[in-house]
């Protein structure tokens, strides 16, 4: 996969939106575990008050954002880990967070990894999808996506009827402009989108 070109050369918000409907999976011992991306968020670097690199912050913890586009940036909060990918050229610390997937491959293993939690609870959030894939550490942080067991299949894209742009989730410490910036993208009506109310679920999960 030509991840370097995919994750550079255009606005990070556009890259983030283009990830919707792409297969995202983890290859574990020959087994494929994952599904279609249904929700993602863009973070726009040193001027984005919600970004880990805001103001030019650079540390061992967020170094992945500063690397070349297509580099994995895994960060942790408490016991949870989150999967991001650096966008833009090295030194321009922007990135996208994969927030949710609709599970397709390795469902039995996902159920085990999530302690039996099934249905939308399986992968309807960024920490949940990492748990479902069996990822518990930052071991693959800083690795090029192409050299890792994670795959985003750029040759396939499940078409969504509508992709919604909305404010990012949990951004309360930023100034209002950044807190309300429409940098979260999701498939309208897909039950695996984090926080999607049951009354808004579509029978076809929002796919064409």
Swiss-Prot record:
Cross-referenced NCBIfam families: 3mg
Pfam families in alphabetical order: Pur_DNA_glyco
One term of GO molecular function: alkylbase DNA N-glycosylase activity
CDD domains: AAG
Annotated organism of origin: Lactobacillus delbrueckii subsp. bulgaricus (strain ATCC BAA-365 / Lb-18)
Annotated Gene3D superfamilies: Methylpurine-DNA glycosylase (MPG)
Superkingdom of origin organism: Bacteria
HAMAP family: 3MGH
Name of the featured protein: Putative 3-methyladenine DNA glycosylase
